[in-house]
Amino acid sequence: MALVKLKPTSAGRRAMVKVVNADLYKGRPHAALVEKQSKNAGRNNSGRITVRHQGGGHKQHYRLVDFRRNKDGIAARVERVEYDPNRSANIALICYADGERAYIIAPKGLEVGQTVLSGPEAPIKAGNVLPIRNIPVGSTIHCVELMPGKGAQIARAAGTSVQLLAREGAYAQLRLRSGEVRRVHVECRAAIGVVGNEEHGLRKIGKAGANRWRGIRPTVRGVAMNPVDHPHGGGEGRTGEGGVARSPWGQPAKGYRTRSNKRTDTMIVQRRHKR
């Protein structure tokens, strides 16, 4: 895996930096683990925009990734590592000893031909999945469950990981990449290691069209709109925000906390914001 800065043969390629991985599989995905997905361009069932800046983009098939990893005691061989257009991380196609195949999130260092294992007796090796009660304190883990059996929800993006800080009774403490310290049940499962493709965040798209390929539409500034469309809109000539910066719906846009309280707030030991 390497970062490649392209030659400035055009304005769009002048600042472009790509992540090139020659080891990725170049064929089609495993047909049995692929589903069609339709685009809705950010509209709901009545045709109104509910999510801005979405629309267009290249057609994609959804890869069915196994986030539960609950086939305990059955070794699986890594057949290939593939690109997945639906996420920043790469995925690995594994084949269990009984012939079943599945996609998993590819951790850093996972290579074709290696064996991965799930279950309480699995060795502490990158790609293996164990209950948190069987993982040594201080280990770096990814694809962590929030509820036992629900499937991985934390640390699934490229280059992300979680550190296991402590175990106290039925709960363990994890430090997330954001700085938040959170409790999860020790029966929740996690994979050993760091998610691969860690250079994903260093790429530069180079041109606006690359975002359009991804289905991301332009973001218009509020000060360029009319007053009916945005709190910053209107005025003669170029004007500023005219006060506190606000969202299109009137909420303060900078520093205002919008997170609602939840029942699971009791599981947060330390917030990511330093108070």
Swiss-Prot record:
Record's compositionally biased regions (Basic and acidic residues): 229-239
Pfam annotation, one family: Ribosomal_L2_C
Record flagged with keyword Glycosyltransferase: no
One GO process term, biological-process aspect: cytoplasmic translation
GO molecular function, one term: structural constituent of ribosome
Entry superkingdom: Bacteria
GO CC list: large ribosomal subunit
Biased composition (Polar residues): 39-48
Location of the region described as Disordered in the Swiss-Prot/TrEMBL record: 36-55, 223-275
InterPro entries: NA-bd_OB-fold, Rib_uL2_dom2, Ribosomal_uL2, Ribosomal_uL2_bac/org-type, Ribosomal_uL2_C, Ribosomal_uL2_CS, Ribosomal_uL2_dom3, Ribosomal_uL2_RNA-bd_dom
Alphabetical UniProt keywords: Ribonucleoprotein, Ribosomal protein, RNA-binding, rRNA-binding
HAMAP family with a match to the protein in the record: Ribosomal_uL2_B
Record note on quaternary structure: Part of the 50S ribosomal subunit. Forms a bridge to the 30S subunit in the 70S ribosome.
Similarity-based family: Belongs to the universal ribosomal protein uL2 family.
Function: One of the primary rRNA binding proteins. Required for association of the 30S and 50S subunits to form the 70S ribosome, for tRNA binding and peptide bond formation. It has been suggested to have peptidyltransferase activity; this is somewhat controversial. Makes several contacts with the 16S rRNA in the 70S ribosome.
Name this protein carries in UniProt: Large ribosomal subunit protein uL2
Gene symbol of the encoding locus: rplB
